[in-house]
Amino acid sequence: MERKSYSIDINRIAQYAMYAYCIFALFSLAFSVCRQAGLSFRTSPILIPISPILVTIKQLVLQLTPIALWGIFRFTLPAGVKLLRRCSELMVLYYVLSFILGQCFKFNFVTMMQNGQITPTATILTWIQSSMGLISVIASLVAGCHLCSKHRGNMRKLGIALVLVFIAWLLCSNLLPVAVFYLAGNTQQAAFTCMNLISMITTTSTYIYAYYRMYRAIKTTGCIGQ
């Protein structure tokens, strides 16, 4: 694969983005596990005043770092790999759209409820976000399969990681909830709690591994900072 050269240290930016994502993804996982267990960081006198700040920073980091990593990965790809470029562009578009819509809903730029009903605008935007989410999952799977079959080394490992992300999404978001709903019976509440814990740990682990492999692939695809 032809290597590309850049005057700015994109490799360092990707490294910082990857580290930031890993740190705050683990923080988010710990926060969610504590909440599932009935604990709260807000019970600590030290963390009471900074908890809202940490949560805000966590949300911003987890929303923005994927944009940075996928964007850098896209621009380090050679011109000949058009399929990977299109898949990467779809991923960037999805994360940018999710960030914008998230801010619109958070700051009430879009009216969610009116007279006890969801507004048509909110319905359309939610549908667009869900559709883009499904498209991004498919794009990630296509990119992963392409990398596994056409490349070697770090690029192939990234492909495996992207396929694992799809498998985790399929299991944790689709198959496990249905299985628990139909099989748990009278123990549904406890089963859903266990399922949520398993899903959070699995999803967080696969995404951390995928973005680590993406950082390694970025180093492979370009002489960054030279």
What are these regions (language model features)?
Residues 1-17, 215, 219-226:
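N-terminal juxtamembrane cytosolic/stromal segments of multi-pass membrane proteins
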Residues 12-22, 82-99, 158-171:
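Transmembrane alpha-helical segments of multi-pass membrane proteins
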Residues 21-39:
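Alpha-helical transmembrane segments of multi-pass membrane proteins
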Residues 27, 86, 146, 164-226:
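C-terminal transmembrane-bundle signature of multipass membrane proteins
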Residues 35-51, 106-127, 176-198:
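Interfacial non-cytosolic loop connecting adjacent transmembrane helices
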Residues 50-64, 123-137, 173, 192-204:
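Alpha-helical transmembrane segments of polytopic membrane proteins
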Residues 74-87, 147-158, 219, 223:
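Membrane-interface helix-boundary motifs at transmembrane edges
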Residues 133-160, 209-216:
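Alpha-helical transmembrane segments in multipass membrane proteins, preferentially the mid-helix core
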